[in-house]
Amino acid sequence: MGEVKAGGPSTRVMEGSEHGFATTRVDALLNWAKKYSLFQYPFVTACCGMEYMAMASPRFDMARFGAEVPRFSPRQADLLWVVGTISQRQAPALKRIYEQMADPKWVLAFGTCASCGGFYDNYTTVAGIDKVIPCDVYVPGCPPRPEAVLDGLMLLQDKIARGDRTPAIVKPREDPAQTTEHLVTLQRKERSLP
């Protein structure tokens, strides 16, 4: 008997039969399948929609994460992308859409406005979608880069595989062009030029 982990849930290989067979927990297998079959419903309200369209383009290839085809009926979706600012008038519609989604359902806040209200600090704007519906992953940025959104999608997939429902925030990647080591290397190269 041995432990096998081949990109999916933890399985046990049972020996004793001629060909052997593998067993796993049913919930681990279902979570592994769910994380690669996310049916998204985009709720796009503001300027982050442009980055959403860029992220959905072939350059960033959401298809490799199993979330490429948007559903435009909440009853067929299990991942709600909240993209942009939510006003007080839009909040009841957002809540209704969330309630119509199939269980289990996940929510990804796309951008600073969806995460915390952004720079709109007035009575007409909801200060973060978690005031209206529960949120699983927050992707900060104004607008967030497509790479950060894909990091958020991968973080959500990890949470689904673990069965974790606690909120998570995507941490920004360190840009090599802005690190001090990179700047020191550039300065040395400039000094060595004639």
Curated annotation (Swiss-Prot):
Location, primary (coarse class): membrane
GO biological process, alphabetically ordered: aerobic respiration; electron transport coupled proton transport
E.C. number(s) listed in UniProt: 7.1.1.-
Cofactor field: [4Fe-4S] cluster
Enzyme class: translocase
Residues annotated as binding [4Fe-4S] cluster: 47-48, 113, 142
NCBIfam families xref list: nuoB_fam, PRK06411.1
Family under the similarity heading: Belongs to the complex I 20 kDa subunit family.
HAMAP family xref list: NDH1_NuoB
Protein name in UniProt: NADH-quinone oxidoreductase subunit B 1
